[in-house]
Amino acid sequence: ANPQFLRDPFSGNIIPPNRIHPVGRNVASIYPLPNAPGNFNNYTSAANRVVDDNGFNMRVNHNFSAKDTFFARYSFQNYKLDAPQGQAQCCLPTPPEAKQKFDLGPYVAGIQNTRLRTQGLALNETHIFRPNLINEFRTGFARTTPTTFQSDYGHMAAESLGIRGINVTRFATGLPNINVADFTGLSGGPAFLPVNPRETHYQVSDSIFWMKSRHQLKFGYHYVRRLVSPFTNTDTRSTLNFARNFTNDPVTNTQGTGLATLLIGYSTGGSRGFLLEPYYMTVQDQAWFIQDDWKVNSRLTLNIGVRHEIYWPEREIRNRLTNFDFTNLRLVYAGEDGISRSVGKKTHYKNFGPRFGFAWDVFGSGKTVIRGGFGISHFPEQPSASNLLGQQVPWTISQNFTPETNPTDWSRVPTIDNPFPPIQVVKPRTTAELNAANPRVLGHSWENETPYFETWTLNIERQLHETRLWEVAYAGSRAIHLVFAYNANEVQPGPGSLASRRLLQPLSNVANIIQIDPRNMSVYHGLQTKLVKRYSHGLQFLVSYTFGKSLDFGGSAASGGGQTGGPQTITNIRAGRGPSGYDVKHRGVVSYVYELPFGRNKKWVNRPGWSEKFAGGWQLSGITTLTTGRPFNVGLAQGVNNGAPIWPDRIRRGTLPNPDPYYWFDATAFVAPPPNTYGNVGRGVLYSPGHVNFDVSLVKNITFGERMRLQFRADAFNLFNTPAFGFPNASIGSPTVGRITSTLIGIDNRDLQFALKLEF
C-alpha cells in the first residue's frame, strides 16, 4: 500500500573498485592529506595576504611665451593583492603529486588574486589673446582595468581531471566549484570569478573666457568617448554538487556521505552561467554651452546660460547586443535585419538646458540679499541598465540540472565526466523559438528619452549682526524620464494556478520580460533655514533645519528599490506614487566650537602661572543631528493572489500614539485583500524611527614658549549611546510583525577616543 524506494548497500559498505568513477577518483585525489588529529576539522593551513602597490606621477610645465602656457600630467598605479578568500575555506594547497599529474593551480581552495592598473594623461594649453579674452584647451584619457581571478586561472584544471565541457573559454579555466557534503569544497576561487571590467575615457574640451563691460562670458565645447567592458559572471566555471542523496538510506535518510557520491561519479545538482566572451561598449556624448554673468548694476547680478547635450546610445564593437521588440514580440539583434547598431534605441538632439539665476541686494546695504535660480540639467542613463542588453540570450549561457532524489533511470543523471550538454549559440527570433528556450528576456525602450533634472531655488539672506547671519530658502526639483525596470510579462491576479494563468501573458512560456523604460519621475520640495554665528568672544555655531518631501514611482518593480520598492502592478504605475526610499521629513543639525572663558586674554584666570596653564586653553566642540525616519512598505507574509504582487488593504492609518521598537505600528490596520484583487495600501505609508546623535570633542592646548604646543583631545561619537533603530518587520501575518530587531548600518554605538599631540 505504501511502496518505498530501496537502495541495496555495497558489500561491507565499501564501494567496489569497478564502481568507482575514474574522474571521481581524480577529484578526490587532489584533496591534501590530513595534518591534524581527528576525523573532522583535521586540516589546518594559512596563507599570507600579499599586497604590492606602486605608482608614480609626472608633470611637465612649459611656457611657450608670456601668452601661451602648457602642461602635461601622467599618473600610473599598479596594485596587486593575493589574499585568502575567507576563513571557512582558507586554504587548501594543491598536493605536489596532484600538481604533477594534473594541470592545477597552487591552491585547490581559498585564494583569489586582484590586479588593478590605473593610468591617466592630461594635456592643457592656455592662450591669452587679450587681457579680457582667454582660451583654455584640454584633452586626456583615463583607463582603469580592475581584475579579480581565482588562483588557478589559466589552468585547464577541469579538463585534465577528466571533467569535459567546463574549460570552454579562456575565462572558464580552472576548477569548477565542487561542493562535497561534509567536506571543504574544492574551487580555485569564488564562483563568479574571474571578473575583468575595463573602462577607458577619452575627452576633449575647449573654453573661451571673455570679459566685456559688465558681462563675463564663457563659451565651451566638451566631448567624451568611453570604452566600457562590464565583464562580470555569476557562475563561470560551473558548480557541481555531491550531496548524500545517492549513497544514503532512502528510508531513514541517514548514513550517506558526499565523498561516496563523488566517487561513484553522479552529481546531485549543478549549474553554470556566464558570458561567452567579454563585450565592449562604446559610449559617446558631447555638449556646448554659453554662460553670461551680467552685473546689471551694483545691486543686481544675473546669470543667464544654455547648455545643449547629446548622448548617443551605447554600441558594442562587434554588435553583440539584443533588444526586445514589444510591438512584434520578438528579439532583435544589433546590425541585423535593418536594426541599428544601438538595437533600436534613438538619439535625441533637443536636449537644451537653460539656466537662469539672480542675486539682488534689496536695500543696497549688503545686509539683505535675495537669490534665486532655475535650471535644467540632462544626464546619461546609468550604464548598468543598458549594459545588460549584452548580457542575455544568445550572448550568455545558463544551464542547470537537479536530478531526482531517488532516480530509477540512472542514464538521466549527469555524470561527473560530462555534466552539461554542449554549448550551442542560437539566436531565437520568432516567438516560438524564444518560448522554447524559456529565458528571462530583457528589453529597453526604443524611444530612449534622456533623463533630466529641473531645479529651482529662492533664498533670502539677512545679516542680523556683524557676526550673525540668518538664511531661509525654498528648494525644489523634478526629475523626468528616470530609468524604471519592471516585468512587462506580469501575471495578473486571478483564479487557478500560476502556470495556467501564464497562458494569458504576452509570452506564455517566458516567466519574465524585464523592460527598461524611462517612465519614472521624482519631485522634491524643501524648506531650508539656518542661523550662522561667526567666531567672536570664543564662540561660533551653525544651526540648520530642513523640512522636505520627496516623491517618486519607486525604484524598480523588477528588483525592488530599497524599503519602498516599486509599484504594485505595471498596469497602474501612477498608483505607486509615494515617498522616495531616502525621504526624510525633518532634519536638524547644530554644530559649534566654544573656547571656555578661562586663561590668557579670557574673562577668568587671566594671569600667568600654572593656574592659567591648567584652566586655560580648553575648547568644546560638537555636532548634534536630529532626523526623522524613512518610509517603508507594508506587505503580506502569505500570498493571496497566486503569484501576483501581495500588498494588503489598509483599513485605518496604522500608526500608534506611543510606538516602541517591540510594537512600532498597528498591524491590525492592514488586512489581506479579497482573492484575485490588488491591495489598496500605498508605497511608503509608514516611517521608521528617527534618530538623535551627539558627537562631542573636548580639546586642551598647552603652550610652551612660542615654538611648542601640547594638545590633548577626547572625542565621543554618539556620546549618549543612542540606538538608531532600523526598519520593523512589516509582513502582515508574521509572528514578529511590527518588531524592530536591527539598527541602521553606519551609525555605531558610542565610540570614545583619546589623543595626545606634540607640535614643535
Per-segment meaning from a language model:
Residues 1-658, 680-760:
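Short acidic-glycine motifs
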Residues 662-676:
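Flexible internal linker/loop segments at domain or repeat junctions
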